[in-house]
Each structure stands twice: as C-alpha cells, then as structure tokens.
Swiss-Prot record:
This is Deaminated glutathione amidase. Belongs to the carbon-nitrogen hydrolase superfamily. NIT1/NIT2 family. The gene is ybeM. It comes from the Bacteria. Hydrolyzes deaminated glutathione (dGSH) to 2-oxoglutarate and L-cysteinylglycine, and no activity on glutathione or L-glutamine. May function as a metabolite repair enzyme. It comes from Escherichia coli O157:H7. The keyword Translocase does not apply. Its EC number is 3.5.1.128. The active site is at E40 (proton acceptor), K110 (proton donor), C147 (nucleophile).
Length: 262
C-alpha cells in the first residue's frame, strides 16, 4: 500500500492550518494513499509565543477537526495528526488522532513530554498514561507515537511486540545543535529495533526542521523531505516486513522482558 507524510509551517491562525491540512489530505488521496501522516500540534504556532498551541486548544468535537473530518469523508484514507485538546483550565493534552471516513477511530495522548534542551512541554501539557491500541490499515498493523516518544525505544518495541508493522510519528522536531542528526539516527534505529516501517511527518518553519521521512524495516530511507513544505510517498508491504524479520529476527532473539509502562 502507499503511505505518505506531509509537512508545512504551522501558522498562528487555526483556520488557515486546517485548510492546509485539508489540501494535503486531498493531494494524498488523489494519489491513492492509504495511510497519511501530518505533523504535531497543528492548531497554531507562533515563534514569539511558545504557549499559543495550548492557548488555542480545541475539543475533539471542535471546528478544526470538524474541517478535517469532512475532508476525511471524501476518501478511504487513514489520516494521522496531533492537536492540543483541553484537559484542565489552562492546560491541554497533546492528542494524536486517527481519522477514517470522517470518524475518529483512535486517539493517543502523548506519553513522553518534551522536557529537554531548555524546553518544558509539561509546564502547560499533561502527559497521557496509556499506549494506544494498534490500528489496522489495509491489513497492516500500525503503532502510534508522537515526536519525543521517538527517543524512548520501549514504546516502539512494545507496539512491535503487539504486532505493529508500521510506526507513525507526527512531530515538530525543534532545531538545534546535532538535532537533525538525532532525528535521522533515531528514526533509523527505531525501524531497526522493531523491524517496522517508520512514517514520520515533521513540521517545517523557523523553529522546526521538517525532514519528514519514510524508512523501511531495514533502516533504509525510502522517501525524504527537506526543510521546505512537501508531500512524500512510498510503497510499503507486509512481505518486506516478513523478509526483514526472517533475516533479522531481533523480536524473537530478545532476552529481556517486554517493556511495561510505569
């Protein structure tokens, strides 16, 4: 099946961001994409107000997702993205949602909040407390992760042991010394750790690197974007997963217990 990742620079106006997302969804659907991943925290972004995305939080029943759900009804594609959803007054969850045929079929509150590199996501965002069930798309099992989750191999491994063949990752990977190197290294490492495909969508713009990637179970990049707005696509197959796992049976060779969420 064909998978895709779309990237753009999120603006401070949620209506504009919704239209960009809907346009990318339409482009992906026109190419018969089955699984489409958008970046993280799509409601609003402002280089001078780090809290704008949380301040702009909307309910899952809100207008932003309403626009995307209407677009989703037009195709057979599964679309993955994250937005901030109100939790308690002044706070939010960083919530991944999966859309199919206009319906929200999965949700996942980000487990690992980005309290690193002088940024403290937990100041305004509440962490989730459970791993999302796997999705099924065109007969392939899909695991859900968000951005900073990439640095924690236990989440990817837990989902691979549950049967995941593809791991999706909406992200807004912040620029900084060696951060692009970390991104490419970690994506390849998670693919190799789990012998899963990785489909990662990274927001571009002044603060984030973009560089969306699709990586095969052997850690090979099969589609990649630069720092500019882009839509990338690649073919993925269960046969490739089986082939790699026959040659590199790391999931069967493990001598450690399966990861457990604290």
């Amino acid at each position: 099946m064909l998978v895709a990742a779309g990237q753009f620079a999120v603006t401070s106006v949620w209506e504009k961001n919704a239209e960009i997302c809907a346009s990318l969804m339409a482009q992906a659907a026109e190419n018969d994409v089955s699984l489409f991943v958008l970046p993280e925290a799509l409601l609003a972004r402002d280089d001078h107000d780090a809290d704008l995305s949380v301040k702009s939080a909307q309910l899952l029943e809100g207008e932003f997702l309403g626009r995307l759900r209407r677009e989703s009804k037009r195709n057979m594609m599964t679309t993955i993205l994250t937005i901030h959803v109100p939790s308690t007054p002044g706070r939010a969850w960083n919530m991944l949602v999966a859309l199919q045929a206009g319906n929200i079929v999965a949700r996942y509150a980000k487990l690992h909040l980005y309290d690193a590199f002088a940024i403290q996501e937990s100041r305004r965002v509440d962490a989730g407390n459970e791993i999302a069930p796997l999705l099924e798309v065109e007969g392939m099992k899909v695991g859900l992760m968000t951005c900073y989750d990439l640095r924690f191999p236990e989440l990817a491994l837990a989902q691979a042991l549950q049967g995941a063949e593809i791991l999706v990752l909406p992200a807004a990977w912040v620029r900084g010394p060696l951060k692009e190197h970390h991104w490419s290294t970690l994506l390849a490492a998670r693919a190799l750790d789990t012998t899963c495909y990785m489909v990662a969508a990274g927001e571009c713009g002044n603060k984030n690197i973009g560089q969306s990637r699709i990586i095969d179970p052997f850690g090979v990049t099969i589609a990649a974007a630069s720092e500019m707005p882009a839509l990338i696509m690649a073919e993925v197959t269960p046969e490739r997963v089986r082939q790699v796992r026959a040659q590199l049976p790391v999931l069967n060779n493990r001598r450690f217990a399966p990861p457990q969420l604290l």
